[in-house]
Each structure stands twice: as structure tokens, then as C-alpha cells.
From Swiss-Prot:
Protein name from the UniProt record: Vacuolar ATPase assembly integral membrane protein vma21
One GO biological process term: vacuolar proton-transporting V-type ATPase complex assembly
Intracellular or extracellular location(s): Endoplasmic reticulum membrane; Endoplasmic reticulum-Golgi intermediate compartment membrane; Cytoplasmic vesicle, COPII-coated vesicle membrane
Residue positions of motif Prevents secretion from ER: 104-107
Gene name of this polypeptide: vma21
């Protein structure tokens, strides 16, 4: 009858065994490129400062708080749609580069 832990290596066997080979090259690139992070941080700052700033600028020029609120909401939407457009353009460029690479591999 076999022992309970017959499949497992003892500590001495594991220590005597050669270390697993390391890969020749490893991918150390970040999961998200730095320029994407910088764009996100820039648009985040714009989303915080823009609408609040527009609200107070509009109120300072004598408009009612309702008009200032609408102005702030419009500003937030403009910033949001601009971010979406920039992200779409970036994705479009990435797809074009991938298509060119695929085209070169096919030749």
C-alpha cells in the first residue's frame, strides 16, 4: 500500500532538483501605455476643473444659478465627448497599425 504523500517530493528532493529555467526574454512592457494614462489624467482634471470653473464664471457674469448649472453640464458633456473622440482616434490608429502588420506578414 502506498503512502499518503507518495506523489509529493520531500524537501530534500525539491532542494536538490535543478531550478526551473528562466525564459530568455520576458515582456516587461506596462499593461497600459503611459500616454494613455496621461490623457486620462488630463481629461480627469478637465472634468473636475472645467464644469466647476464654468459654473462660477457664469454666476460671476450675473447669470442665474440655473443658467450656470446648464453651462456646467454642457461643459462636462463637451469634455466627455472629446475624451471619447480622442480614444476612438487612438483605437483607430492602433487598428490601422495592426492591419499593416498583418498585411506585411501575409506577403
Amino acid at each position: 500500500m502506498a503512502g499518503r504523500h507518495s506523489q509529493e517530493k520531500s524537501y530534500a528532493e525539491a532542494a536538490a532538483a535543478p531550478a526551473p529555467e528562466k525564459p530568455d526574454s520576458s515582456d516587461v512592457t506596462p499593461a497600459v501605455p503611459a500616454d494613455v494614462i496621461y490623457k486620462l489624467l488630463g481629461f480627469t482634471a478637465a472634468m473636475i476643473v472645467g464644469p466647476i470653473g464654468m459654473y462660477f464664471v457664469t454666476v460671476d457674469f450675473g447669470a442665474s444659478s440655473t443658467v450656470a448649472g446648464v453651462t456646467a453640464a454642457v461643459t462636462a458633456n463637451v469634455i466627455l465627448f472629446t475624451y471619447i473622440y480622442v480614444a476612438w482616434l487612438e483605437d483607430k490608429e492602433d487598428r490601422e497599425v495592426a492591419a499593416k502588420r498583418k498585411e506585411k506578414k501575409a506577403q
